[in-house]
C-alpha cells in the first residue's frame, strides 16, 4: 500500500510539473545542482561567493516556510548568475510537496497575448492571462525585458495587481537593479564632449507604481556576481 501511495504521489507531481511548463533548458535545475564552483582553478571573489550563497539560502528559506510566508521573491542580478536556476528550484520543490505552480517567461507572455489579438486566433487576452493571474505559485522570468510601452505596463499591472489582491505567491527574476551605478563615460565625441548612457532601473522598465507594489509582494534578493556563463567554460553548464 505504501509503495502504491508513493507511486501515486510521484505520478501526480509529474503531471503538475508538466502543467507548470518549465522549459527543458531548466528541467535540471534544483538546489543541489546550484553550485558556486568554477572550473580551471578559478574562484569567485569572497564578496561574489557570499552573494550567491546568500541568494540560495534565502530562496531555500522561502520554500521551507511556504505557505506561512507572506512575501514572494524578487531575484535581481545580471545575466548568468543563477536567478532562473534558483526560481525553478523553488518551484520544483514546492510542486514536489504538493503545490501547484507555473513558469512564465515575461517576453513570451507578451507575445502570446499579442498573438491572441489576431482575428484567426482561438485564444483571447484573458484566456492567456488567466493561468498567470491565478496560479498558486508563479515564476515570472526576466521581468522588464520588453520595452515598457503603455500596453506592456498595462499588462504587467493586470498580472501583478490580480496576484497582489488574491495574495498569490510570486517569484520574479530580473536583470534590472533598483538603482544603477554611476555610469562610465564613453570616449570623447568630436568637440571634446562625453556622452554618458544611463542604464534603466527596474522602475523604468515596469513603472514606478508596479515597482512600489513589488515592495509589498516580494522580498528583494540582489545577486551581485559576474556572469557565470562567461566565467565558467564547463560544457553544458548554464545559468540564467
Where in this protein do the model-derived segments appear?
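Interdomain "pre-motor" coupling segment immediately N-terminal to P-loop NTPase/helicase cores
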Residues: 1-25
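Pre-Walker A (pre-P-loop) alpha-helix and adjacent loop at the N terminus of AAA/AAA+ ATPase modules
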Residues: 36-73
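Short glycine-rich substrate-engagement loop in P-loop NTPases that contacts/grips substrate
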Residues: 43-52, 95-134, 150
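Walker A/P-loop nucleotide-binding motif
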Residues: 69-87
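P-loop NTPase Walker A phosphate-binding motif
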Residues: 85-99
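Loop/turn-to-beta-strand initiation segments
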Residues: 99-100, 134-137, 166-172
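Conserved Walker B
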Residues: 135, 142-144
Amino acid at each position: 500500500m505504501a509503495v502504491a501511495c508513493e507511486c501515486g504521489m510521484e505520478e501526480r507531481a509529474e503531471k503538475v510539473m508538466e502543467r507548470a511548463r518549465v522549459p527543458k533548458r531548466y528541467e535540471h535545475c534544483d538546489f543541489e545542482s546550484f553550485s558556486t564552483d568554477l572550473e580551471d582553478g578559478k574562484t569567485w571573489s569572497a564578496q561574489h561567493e557570499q552573494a550567491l550563497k546568500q541568494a540560495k539560502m534565502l530562496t531555500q528559506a522561502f520554500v521551507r516556510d511556504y505557505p506561512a510566508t507572506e512575501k514572494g521573491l524578487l531575484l535581481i542580478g545580471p545575466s548568468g548568475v543563477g536567478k532562473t536556476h534558483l526560481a525553478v528550484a523553488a518551484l520544483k520543490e514546492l510542486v514536489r510537496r504538493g503545490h501547484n505552480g507555473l513558469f512564465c517567461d515575461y517576453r513570451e507572455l507578451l507575445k502570446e497575448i499579442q498573438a491572441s489579438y489576431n482575428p484567426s486566433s482561438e485564444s483571447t487576452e484573458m484566456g492567456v492571462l488567466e493561468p498567470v493571474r491565478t496560479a498558486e505559485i508563479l515564476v515570472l522570468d526576466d521581468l522588464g525585458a520588453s520595452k515598457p510601452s503603455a500596453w506592456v505596463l498595462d499588462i504587467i499591472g493586470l498580472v501583478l495587481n490580480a496576484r497582489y489582491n488574491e495574495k498569490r505567491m510570486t517569484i520574479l527574476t530580473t536583470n534590472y537593479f533598483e538603482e544603477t551605478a554611476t555610469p562610465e563615460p564613453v570616449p570623447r565625441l568630436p568637440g571634446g564632449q562625453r556622452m554618458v548612457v544611463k542604464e534603466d532601473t527596474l522602475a523604468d522598465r515596469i513603472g514606478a507604481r508596479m515597482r512600489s507594489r513589488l515592495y509589498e509582494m516580494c522580498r528583494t534578493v540582489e545577486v551581485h556576481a559576474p556572469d557565470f556563463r562567461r566565467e565558467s567554460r564547463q560544457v553544458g553548464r548554464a545559468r540564467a
